[in-house]
Amino acid sequence: TQGVSSAASDVYKRQDDMHRDLADCYRNWTTPLEAVRLLEWLVSGKAAKGAYRDFIEQTMISCQTGRDRLPAPLAVTKAVIGHKTGTGDRNGKGQIIGTNDIGFVFLPDGRRYSIAVLVRDSEESEQATARIIADVSEAVYRYVSGER
């Protein structure tokens, strides 16, 4: 399988591979910073231009999964969020291997920021883990927007 590897990421397993062998979930990894760098590369137009970039942006804005994660605290604001979720299986200890959300936020004043929250081996419920991501999203939004 062809993949992407760097000092801050190692991604070479497909979703199907990870469902068949849970150990593969731990072989695919990145940092939140590296995930945001990749997203910025895509959204800024450096990776794709014109219709291709617009397609990526609109696909992420229309994402319906994980509305209880990064988008949750933004629902009452005029910010626009595009995001993509990732949810892993439970390991042998009953932990959720990975609950993730990465996205970009357009503020009403025209500024934009990107955010990635990656939760590994959560012992919480799916709802409580989503709430952790939402809480981080809210804190970042309040800081960046100045709504403290």
Q: What annotation goes with each model-predicted range?
A:
Residues 1, 23-25, 78:
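Alpha-helical hydrophobic/aromatic positions enriched in membrane-embedded helices and signal peptides
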Residues 27, 31-148:
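Structured C-terminal helix/loop/strand segments within mature extracytoplasmic catalytic/sensor domains
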Residues 15-23, 29:
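Flexible, solvent-exposed loop/hinge segments and secondary-structure transition points
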Residues 1-8, 12:
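Single conserved hydrophobic/aromatic residue that forms the stacking wall/gate
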